[in-house]
Every structure is written in structure tokens, then in C-alpha cells.
């Protein structure tokens, strides 16, 4: 059995989608820890990156519903890809704000959500921004938080690419005679 056949089989099980969801819950819990325990004020870009991360969680839930069903699995994969890509673009823009500050390129002062989903009004403790995008308030191994998000979102895209490629490799069935 090739690695891609194994990944194909793995993507058709609940464990793979649950694992993705647990990673996202961990990252969101870290964000809330930074905000409410370490008192690091989230900026507008942080909130948008948080929403992108939750998009991956939503995609994981879709895939978790019926991973053996091609429709649910592909909807989950597409949602995972779109959210990861958007998160990567946001994180790279955030890194640019931090390391190439300019008075002409700044993030918004307030988050803007659609009128049909004002997340910052519904759940302000999670989606209200009051920090400065250009300030580096935390580092780990010399990487700022948005730089870590670039790594995380890019890692999601690499994992997704491998799993999407694996969808075109047949799952080898065990020999029933043995």
C-alpha cells in the first residue's frame, strides 16, 4: 500500500477529521489564552486570522459528519483549502505590517463583519479587536505570532495538498482470503 493510498483511507475515517478539529481547538485555545490570560490585545488582523482558523474547524466538522461520503469529504477539503489559503494571505499581510511599517499601509481600526454575522457584537470577548497590528507583542523561537500563523496555515495547505492528491489513489482492500 502506497503512502497516498494510506492517506486516502485515513481521510475517509472520522479520526482524521477529528484530529484536524482538535488541532484547531488547540490553536483557538492558545489565542484565547494569549488574549485573556497573558493580556495580549488582539488586533484586527489577529481576529481575521482567528476567523480563518475557525473556517478550518468548520471544514473539519463538515468532513467529520460523513467522511466516507465523497460529497462531505470534498466539501470539507474545499473548506479546509479556502480557509487555509485565506488565513495564509492574512498572516503574510500581518507580517508585512509588522516588519515593513508604513503610514500608508495599516490595518483597519475596527473589525468589519457582514451585517448578517456581526461576530464582534455577538461574541465580543472573542472577536473584538483593540490591539495594534504593527506591534510585535510576543515571540517564540524568534518568530512573531503572525509568522507562526504563516507556518501553521502553510502547513495546513501542505497537508491538504497531500490528502487531495491521495484522493486519486485507490484504497487497497485487505485480501479476504488471508
Curated annotation (Swiss-Prot):
| Annotated compartments | Cell inner membrane
Which UniProt keywords are given for this protein, alphabetically ordered?
Answer: Cell inner membrane, Cell membrane, Chaperone, Disulfide bond, Electron transport, Membrane, Oxidoreductase, Redox-active center, Transmembrane, Transmembrane helix, Transport
One GO cellular component from the entry? plasma membrane
* InterPro entries documented for this protein: DiS_bond_form_DsbB/BdbC, Disulphide_bond_form_DsbB, DsbB, DsbB-like_sf
Topological domain ranges for the Periplasmic compartment:
34-51, 93-147
By its UniProt entry, which SUPFAM superfamilies does this protein fall under?
DsbB-like
- Spell out the family assignment given in the record's similarity comment: Belongs to the DsbB family.
Q: What does this protein do?
A: Required for disulfide bond formation in some periplasmic proteins. Acts by oxidizing the DsbA protein.
The name this protein carries in UniProt is Disulfide bond formation protein B
Species per Swiss-Prot/TrEMBL record: Vibrio parahaemolyticus serotype O3:K6 (strain RIMD 2210633)
Amino acid at each position: 500500500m502506497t503512502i497516498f493510498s494510506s492517506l486516502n483511507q485515513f481521510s475517509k475515517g472520522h479520526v482524521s477529521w477529528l484530529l484536524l478539529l482538535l488541532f484547531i481547538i488547540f490553536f483557538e485555545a492558545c489565542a484565547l489564552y494569549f488574549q485573556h490570560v497573558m493580556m495580549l490585545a488582539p488586533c484586527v488582523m489577529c481576529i481575521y486570522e482567528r476567523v480563518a482558523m475557525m473556517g478550518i474547524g468548520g471544514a473539519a466538522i463538515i468532513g467529520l459528519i460523513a467522511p466516507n461520503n465523497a460529497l462531505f469529504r470534498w466539501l470539507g477539503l474545499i473548506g479546509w483549502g479556502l480557509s487555509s489559503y485565506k488565513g495564509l494571505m492574512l498572516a503574510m499581510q500581518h507580517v508585512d505590517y509588522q516588519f515593513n511599517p508604513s503610514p500608508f499601509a495599516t490595518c483597519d481600526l475596527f473589525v468589519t463583519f457582514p451585517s448578517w454575522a456581526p461576530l464582534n457584537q455577538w461574541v465580543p470577548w472573542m472577536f473584538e479587536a483593540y490591539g495594534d497590528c504593527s506591534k510585535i507583542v510576543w515571540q517564540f523561537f524568534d518568530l512573531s505570532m503572525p509568522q507562526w500563523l504563516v507556518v501553521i496555515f502553510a502547513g495546513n495547505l501542505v497537508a491538504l495538498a497531500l490528502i487531495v492528491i491521495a484522493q486519486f489513489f485507490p484504497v487497497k482492500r485487505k485480501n479476504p482470503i488471508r
